[in-house]
């Protein structure tokens, strides 16, 4: 049986003699043309610590592909550092990079007729970008997460990158000394690897274990550790076996497996960005999935992991406590996962979890049993109302009472909001409205970690609301509501809010509304005019033209 069903289109037959000539230049031998061609989509980059440790993983995958009697073909994918671009115009490129990465992988895999692809990535958008490509092309593939960073430490306190963002607010509020401010800055990121809490990178990589597209335990390993290198090699070996078994992404990515992934996200307290990304992944896999499905699962699945940003621990702690397999086994025993879903190994999820204990160890408090859940329901709530007729996403963990009604403080760019926060012009009870930051208006839905962290640092996390048609970082917590749709740029009602309007955020009732009459909104709408596009050329303009609404994943195809 031939295992090069795709690559034979480019290597076999008399007419492909020139093609083989080029392969000979790369060191191929005649017998290699009967072997599968396996792409290694290598996201290595020295732009960011999230991706700076990926080359070792790519090298291990290359060696494992060769040892499995297949041909590795290495190509690069770009990355944007969300942490570094945060609060700047560069953040507008973050979500766009998801689409660019997906397009890069699709282009290489399809253009070169690859028989399979090992995708290796680190920073936030690397994960959904890679998975969108695998789902879109349906070429056999596996995702290798670059691994988490190790926690930093200053004066005995563990740190993550969010510690540094929050320190900005604390320092400007006079609640932190200059010594401690600089100490946090210098020690927040002590190694290579992606940001350490259950932020977007760890959320998406963890969910890929539940989805069935990554190996068990791989998402919580630290990038510098040898086990991460070994896992990359094993992932490549497993992919070659999947090629031989003809297991394709769409055999794995189904409505039921996406339900598993979302249940895992709820149980671990994951990032709001997962909503946007799983809408896009489902779209690419041609799986029926809507924003309302997240709310359906939220009501069934409790939060059982005590993880940052709204909890205490980081990914390395989760790994020591049993990792994602332990969380999944608890959910499976509670009837909250579909155990019959296929995984990349060819085994079902239930079979993969057979060796995992039914309950977490008693000597840790990172993973809790169901009966001791931190929250009875999931934390990512879908709010609707006259400010979000298509829906908006709220993260409701970490708050004593996720309800507020207060005056709108309206900003049309992040910098103005940040200046107001740092100048103590935002008061308890206010509701910040940041708009014209959606998929088309931003464009690119930039993340708002800097202002939300400054609010936390100022001690206002429980008392100030924050809504936007942009996004929030996975490191954000507080009374925040993002992904408001329809967005302001297309005339969503968020565009009609005026300074001082009464706004209600009620996560219990799942309501997001501006408390003015329908007649007044209609009058304002008649006066509203769409702003001139911020960009007319280049990738930002292209994304603005193509992107769908956030409630459908901000996809471009």
Curated annotation (Swiss-Prot):
Functions in the biosynthesis of branched-chain amino acids. Catalyzes the dehydration of (2R,3R)-2,3-dihydroxy-3-methylpentanoate (2,3-dihydroxy-3-methylvalerate) into 2-oxo-3-methylpentanoate (2-oxo-3-methylvalerate) and of (2R)-2,3-dihydroxy-3-methylbutanoate (2,3-dihydroxyisovalerate) into 2-oxo-3-methylbutanoate (2-oxoisovalerate), the penultimate precursor to L-isoleucine and L-valine, respectively. Pathway: Amino-acid biosynthesis; L-isoleucine biosynthesis; L-isoleucine from 2-oxobutanoate: step 3/4; Amino-acid biosynthesis; L-valine biosynthesis; L-valine from pyruvate: step 3/4. Transmembrane segments: none annotated. The keyword Amino-acid biosynthesis applies. It catalyses: (2R)-2,3-dihydroxy-3-methylbutanoate = 3-methyl-2-oxobutanoate + H2O; (2R,3R)-2,3-dihydroxy-3-methylpentanoate = (S)-3-methyl-2-oxopentanoate + H2O. Binds 1 [2Fe-2S] cluster per subunit. This cluster acts as a Lewis acid cofactor. The active site is at residue 473. Its cofactor is [2Fe-2S] cluster; Mg(2+). InterPro entries: DHAD_IlvD/Edd (IPR050165), Dihydro-acid_dehy_C (IPR042096), DihydroxyA_deHydtase (IPR004404), DiOHA_6PGluconate_deHydtase_CS (IPR020558), ILV_EDD_C (IPR056740), ILV_EDD_N (IPR000581), IlvD/EDD_N (IPR037237). Coiled coil: none annotated. This is Dihydroxy-acid dehydratase 1. Belongs to the IlvD/Edd family. Pfam families: ILV_EDD_C, ILVD_EDD_N. Homodimer. One of its GO terms (molecular function) is 2 iron, 2 sulfur cluster binding.
């Amino acid at each position: 049986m031939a295992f090069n069903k795709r690559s034979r289109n480019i290597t076999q037959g008399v007419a492909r003699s020139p093609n083989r000539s080029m392969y000979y230049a790369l060191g191929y031998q005649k017998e290699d043309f009967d072997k599968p061609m396996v792409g290694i989509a290598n996201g290595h980059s020295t732009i960011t610590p999230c991706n700076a440790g990926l080359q070792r993983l790519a090298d291990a995958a290359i060696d494992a592909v060769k040892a499995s009697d297949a041909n590795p073909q290495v190509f690069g994918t770009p990355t944007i550092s969300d942490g570094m671009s945060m609060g700047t115009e560069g953040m507008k490129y973050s979500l766009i990079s998801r689409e660019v990465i997906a397009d890069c992988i699709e282009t290489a895999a399809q253009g070169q007729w690859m028989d399979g692809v090992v995708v290796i990535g680190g920073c936030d958008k690397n994960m959904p970008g890679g998975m969108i490509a695998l789902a879109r092309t349906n070429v056999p593939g596996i995702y290798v997460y670059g691994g988490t960073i190790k926690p930093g430490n200053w004066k005995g306190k563990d740190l993550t990158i969010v510690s540094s963002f929050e320190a900005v607010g604390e320092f400007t509020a006079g609640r932190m000394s200059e010594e401690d401010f600089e100490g946090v800055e210098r020690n927040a990121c002590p190694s290579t690897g992606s940001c350490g809490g259950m932020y977007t990178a760890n959320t998406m990589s963890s969910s890929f274990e539940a989805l069935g597209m990554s190996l068990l335990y791989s998402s919580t390993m630290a990038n510098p550790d040898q086990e991460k290198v070994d896992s990359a090699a094993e992932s490549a070996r497993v992919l070659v076996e999947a090629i031989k078994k003809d297991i394709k992404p769409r055999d794995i990515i189904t409505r039921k497996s996406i339900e598993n992934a979302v249940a895992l996200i709820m149980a671990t307290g994951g990032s709001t960005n997962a909503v946007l990304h799983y809408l896009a992944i489902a779209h690419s896999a041609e799986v029926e999935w809507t924003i309302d499905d997240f709310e359906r699962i939220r009501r069934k699945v409790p939060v059982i992991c005590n993880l940052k940003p709204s909890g205490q621990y980081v990914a390395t702690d989760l790994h020591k406590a049993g990792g994602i397999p332990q969380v999944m086994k608890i959910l499976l025993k509670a009837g909250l996962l579909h155990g019959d879903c296929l995984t990349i190994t060819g085994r079902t999820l239930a079979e993969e979890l057979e060796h995992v204990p039914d309950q977490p160890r008693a000597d840790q408090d990172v993973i809790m049993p169901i009966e001791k859940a931190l929250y009875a329901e999931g934390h990512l709530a879908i709010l609707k109302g006259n400010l979000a007729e298509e829906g908006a996403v709220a993260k409701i963990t970490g708050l004593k009472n996720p309800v507020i009604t207060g005056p709108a403080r309206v900003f049309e760019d992040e910098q103005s909001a940040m200046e107001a926060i740092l100048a103590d012009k935002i008061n308890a009870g206010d509701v910040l409205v940041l708009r014209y930051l959606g998929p088309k208006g931003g464009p690119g839905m930039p993340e708002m970690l800097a202002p939300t962290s400054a609010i936390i640092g100022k001690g206002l996390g429980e008392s100030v609301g924050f809504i936007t048609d942009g996004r929030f970082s996975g490191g954000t917590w507080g009374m925040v509501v993002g992904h408001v749709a329809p967005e302001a740029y297309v005339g969503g009602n968020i565009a009609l809010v005026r300074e001082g309007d009464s706004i209600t955020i009620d996560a219990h009732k799942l309501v997001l509304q501006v408390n003015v009459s329908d007649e007044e909104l209609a009058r304002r709408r008649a006066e509203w005019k769409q702003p001139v596009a911020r960009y007319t050329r280049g990738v930002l303009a292209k994304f603005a033209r193509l992107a769908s609404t956030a409630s459908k994943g901000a996809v471009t195809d």
